Amino acid sequence: MNLRAMQDALRKRRVSNGQLAGLCFVFVWFFVGGIMHFLATETEASIVPPYVPMPVVAVLVSGVLELLGAIGILLPRTRKAAGIGLFMLTLAVTPAHIYMLQRPELFHVPVWALWLRLPIQVALLVLIWWSTWQLRPRRARP
């Protein structure tokens, strides 16, 4: 399904332009992110906290889940379930971001960027919720 087909399907369901933009953003975020789990596996595994066993496996599994979730939000029948899955996955990877803040010397990322990542994570959670769970028909205009 291409972007135009997705837009047409969503418009038939009377989704707001804002929610459509949110869905597109969430799709791109997780689709690109999921691919990066396979293209940069070692880099991704390096941010997994040491208490998580088999970091490479964790990265690969989360990459598959990101790709499945991204594809799932495109389909009206699976959108809500995929949104819940992406929401939970986003919560599940938050300890990696906290670990990076606790040990910034291990990573080649400015500390300010590590701090910025936390509110971005919250905004992403809100966007996932709003664009996948709260789809409401537009009110008819008089």
Descriptions of predicted regions:
Residues 2-142:
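Membrane-interface extramembranous regions
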